[in-house]
Amino acid sequence: MNKSSTKTLIALSMMAVSSGVSAHGYVSETNDGIAGSRAALCKFPTSDTQEKNRDCGAVQWEPQSVEGPEGFPEKGPADGQIAGAGLVQFSELNEQTADRWVKRPITAGAQTFEWTFTANHVTRTWKYYMTKQNWNPNAVLTRDSFDLTPFCELEYNMEKPPLYPNTFSHECIVPEREGYQVILAVWDVGDTAAAFYNVIDVKFDGNGGVVDPTWSQGGQINPTRDLNVGERVFTRVFDASGENVSLSTELVIENETQGQANNWTHALATKINKEQQNIGAGQLNDKGEFSPQYGPNPVYLKAGSGLKSVEIGYQLETVEPVYHLDIEGLASEYTIGDSATELDLSLYATGDMNVELTVYNHGKEALANTNVTLKDGDAKSVVMALSKSEKGHHMLVSRIKNMDGELIKQDMSDFHLVEEAVTPPPSGDFDFVFPEGVKDYKAGTKVLAEDSNVYQCKEFPYSGYCVQWTETATNFAPGVGSDWSMAWDKVN
């Protein structure tokens, strides 16, 4: 394997940089870089096909932070953790299969590798390693996956690469390979005991990287979402006159497995290749053959067909979630007693929801409040004790919100608080309701007493006691006073 001994350094175009970040750098293809790193393509689409890596985890927010122990290959990240630099937060990068990551086309020979810096460091070296020709693309990356002699090495003499403009590139001689390979770029900084590890997924084509000139890319099938059974995904084909619906290829999802994002992309690409003469989907080899992928699939248009582009459309089922709350146990009336009035309620939920219940009196004063989270099918009992109990109209207001806090429905139910009912004697069986008219009482006067019974004033000489009552002298009050029997006879 050849190892280049001379490198060409090129300062490239300006890019803005934030001086407040503490992160560092990544392999990019912003200007003339041959390929962006696996981490970079988690955040930025490719410059030509707009492909991106999916399900990357936290690295999609900070591809510049894939930093691990220096000293590769003797030291550095452990086998199986090389792509993520040994950092648990970037462990998704360690996944490795033949179709997991977007691959960038490359050819052997002189190629430019570009770095984007968000904060620069004094630098010892950049080193580039490549997988062996017979490596296993379906096994995690280990030291045994790579030729551990770097095919390119640049000494930088503890200087800082340019930060603004903050892309920096150098030329390397890429050795011969075939098919899918992984390049490991290691930036060894000089002011810490760390290095930055960027793996780059590339593909060597048998014809030296030149795509069959009879085909040009006109679109991309991306696994943007899972689809439900019965939903449809289809191509929208455009020529100079606009959309040509007769060239559309449609896939109806038949089962849950087919609806998984990586599966339907493969199925749609396969169907395109069966149905269309001037459209192909998948990886294109030097023989003009297409291989559908489980994941992103480029869509190609045949030269001379008059076709301009292909977009992807969806016909999705919109299933509105159902929310319903049954409240049982609310009575129309509650009798006021000596203790606080309580509402003993049972709640039954359809759909996941947050429920807020509030009791108001007629004056709109809140007397009780509770919040309950219910899952679909849940049943729960709640007891609401009112802060005060006064006779009259009251309201129970229920507010149903989804799990995002959005109001779904509000309902109000009326009820009343009533005082304990008193059954008076039949009309005409008493003359007064005690103590009304107390000064007019005489022998034979009948009164309705506080205990709801009727009493009759005794004959002389005891009748004189019947009028002896004030709010502070109640001993002759009928039925309840300490000496009531001296003045009164109980009638019922």
Curated annotation (Swiss-Prot):
<dbReference type="InterPro" id="IPR051024">
    <property type="entry name" value="GlcNAc_Chitin_IntDeg"/>
</dbReference>
<dbReference type="GO" id="GO:0008061">
    <property type="term" value="F:chitin binding"/>
</dbReference>
<keyword id="KW-0147">Chitin-binding</keyword>
<protein>
    <recommendedName>
        <fullName>GlcNAc-binding protein A</fullName>
    </recommendedName>
</protein>
<keyword id="KW-0964">Secreted</keyword>
<feature type="domain" description="Chitin-binding type-3">
    <location>
        <begin position="443"/>
        <end position="484"/>
    </location>
</feature>
<comment type="similarity">
    <text>Belongs to the GbpA family.</text>
</comment>
<dbReference type="GO" id="GO:0005576">
    <property type="term" value="C:extracellular region"/>
</dbReference>
<dbReference type="InterPro" id="IPR020879">
    <property type="entry name" value="GlcNAc-bd_A"/>
</dbReference>
<dbReference type="Pfam" id="PF21868">
    <property type="entry name" value="GbpA_D3"/>
</dbReference>
<dbReference type="InterPro" id="IPR014756">
    <property type="entry name" value="Ig_E-set"/>
</dbReference>
<dbReference type="Pfam" id="PF18416">
    <property type="entry name" value="GbpA_2"/>
</dbReference>
<dbReference type="Pfam" id="PF03067">
    <property type="entry name" value="LPMO_10"/>
</dbReference>
<feature type="signal peptide">
    <location>
        <begin position="1"/>
        <end position="23"/>
    </location>
</feature>
<dbReference type="InterPro" id="IPR054063">
    <property type="entry name" value="GbpA_D3"/>
</dbReference>
<feature type="domain" description="Chitin-binding type-4">
    <location>
        <begin position="24"/>
        <end position="204"/>
    </location>
</feature>
<comment type="function">
    <text>Probably interacts with GlcNAc residues. May promote attachment to both epithelial cell surfaces and chitin.</text>
</comment>
<dbReference type="InterPro" id="IPR004302">
    <property type="entry name" value="Cellulose/chitin-bd_N"/>
</dbReference>
<keyword id="KW-0732">Signal</keyword>
<dbReference type="InterPro" id="IPR041029">
    <property type="entry name" value="GbpA_2"/>
</dbReference>
